[in-house]
A protein has these predicted regions:
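Conserved interdomain hinge at the start of the Helicase C-terminal
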Residues: 205-251
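Conserved nucleic-acid-binding Ia/Ib motif block in the N-terminal RecA-like helicase ATPase lobe
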Residues: 5, 63-129, 137-140, 250-262
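A short beta-strand element within the Helicase C-terminal
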Residues: 294-309, 331-334
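Conserved segment of the helicase C-terminal RecA-like domain
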Residues: 285, 312-353
Length: 442
């Protein structure tokens, strides 16, 4: 078992210390033997709350999967897996979910030999049933967004999964709401419940609410003016329908904005690319359905824009929870048409906001994303990527941003001003002796 240097993990994550919720959860998980239920608002840092103690309990010398983290969707599986990898603590991990072949994941599990696996209930059951994951080595079961797992109808799959793990020692459930009763099949043993929910607080007091009135029913021009005033700060624009997302995203692109489009109708790889571009600063606007309102742990989102009003109070809380994460401050804007009003369930003071009519240039992100068609399975590391781009692409290390190395490909943020130069100079070049595809991600 590795002796964890928690301060080193904090440095890797670019944070100074755990927040109060994370400290309390960590103490209970590490020093008690009971099951644990954590109720904490969206954006409070629940992923790190369970990962920090978990990595201290994992036996890093074992090749068995020791912890399963059940999540309601692939986005949260990918995001949580990325958080653990970013900790660089020597614990191997993998994510499993629908949308790609189970055989591909089977090969990945054999190759990586993860100690922690993040996955959706159905796909985890599939791998347990085929013995791609040994059911006998799993000691810890974490169910993140437990409330959403129940709402999505995963009861039977979760029951099957829990009952198939004979060596299970601890169950850790995390939820942003206290609305759901925990079913008997979870078999919690003297659970220690930690609630950080303040029933009087619908949104963080670090979020300022604004109303932007559009004089016409079509709110595109009001949105354009609003975004111009944000400069290059990171913004999510929420809509209720996929076709509306496509329409608004197209309008913004036609007006020079650098955006990412995100909804459930896109192919898995398109969704991954959209999130990478947004999280690494290559696109400063994410236009999305409520798919982006839960499970995405992207820091430094300054603004939330409700182009369409949220369909429920719960949906509103999760949307606004994307900003003011950790100890940051954020802003949420409601764009209302002539016959629209802000929903009654929105509590707190909502200020009127009038975007400036002053002519401004469309903000362009400093970074752009390139795709490199090699990854971990090709023995390509972050260091290899940096060396290749500096030596062959003519970049300085400071002109390279976030690098996401996947199994078969890599996304890299590079200086937008140098992207065309990089593409020209690396054309036909080899990375670690292998020719590969290098192209922009738009």
């Amino acid at each position: 078992m590795l002796k964890m240097d928690i301060q080193k993990i904090f440095r890797e994550l670019h944070i100074e210390e755990a927040n109060e919720m994370q400290k309390q959860v960590g103490e209970v998980i590490l020093h008690e033997k009971n099951d644990v239920v954590v109720l904490s608002p969206t954006g409070s840092g629940k992923t790190l709350a369970y990962l920090l103690p978990l990595v201290q309990m994992i036996d890093s010398s074992s090749e068995d999967v020791q912890a399963l983290v059940v999540v309601p969707g692939r986005e949260l599986a990918l995001q949580s897996d990325q958080v653990l990898r970013s900790m660089r603590c020597g614990i191997r991990s993998a994510s499993c979910y629908g949308g790609r072949t189970a055989m591909e994941e089977h090969r990945m599990l054999k190759d990586v030999k993860p100690q922690v696996v993040f996955g959706t209930p159905g796909r985890l059951n599939d791998h347990l049933g085929k013995e791609n994951i040994s059911r006998y080595g799993v000691r810890w079961l974490i169910i993140d967004e437990f409330d959403k797992c129940l709402q999505m109808g995963f009861q039977d799959e979760m029951q099957r999964l829990i009952q198939s793990l004979p060596g299970l020692r601890r169950r850790i459930l995390l939820s942003a709401t206290d609305a759901e009763e925990i079913p008997a099949f979870v078999s919690l043993a003297k659970a220690h419940t930690l609630s950080f929910l303040d029933n009087q607080e619908q949104t963080s007091d670090r979020v300022t609410l604004y109303e932007v009135k559009s004089p016409v029913k079509d709110k595109l021009e009001a949105l354009r003016q609003l975004l111009l005033g944000f400069g290059d700060s990171s913004t999510i624009v929420f809509l209720n329908y996929r076709d509306s997302v496509e329409r608004v995203d197209g309008f913004l692109k036609n007006n020079g904005f650098v955006t990412s489009c995100f909804h459930g109708g896109l192919e898995q790889k398109e969704r991954e690319a959209a999130l990478y571009r947004f999280s690494n600063g290559s696109a400063n606007v994410l236009v999305s359905t409520d798919l982006a309102s839960r499970g995405l742990d992207i820091p430094d989102i300054a603004n939330i824009v409700h182009y369409h009003m949220p369909e429920s109070e719960e949906g509103y809380v999760h949307r606004v929870g994307r900003t003011a994460r950790w100890d940051a401050k954020g802003k949420a804007f409601f764009i209302t048409g002539p016959e629209e009003h802000i929903p009654d369930y929105v509590k707190g003071n909502v200020e009127s906001y009038v975007p400036s009519n002053e002519k401004k240039n469309v903000p362009v992100p400093r970074m752009a994303t390139i795709y490199i068609g090699k990854g971990k399975k090709d023995k390509v590391s972050r260091g290899d990527i940096v060396g290749f781009l500096c030596k062959k692409g003519g970049l300085e290390a400071a002109e390279i941003g976030k690098i996401d190395v996947n199994d078969r490909y890599t996304y890299v943020a590079v200086s937008r001003a140098k992207m065309n130069l990089v593409l020209r100079q690396t054309q036909g070049e080899k990375i670690k002796g292998i020719k590969t595809v290098i192209e922009p991600v738009r």
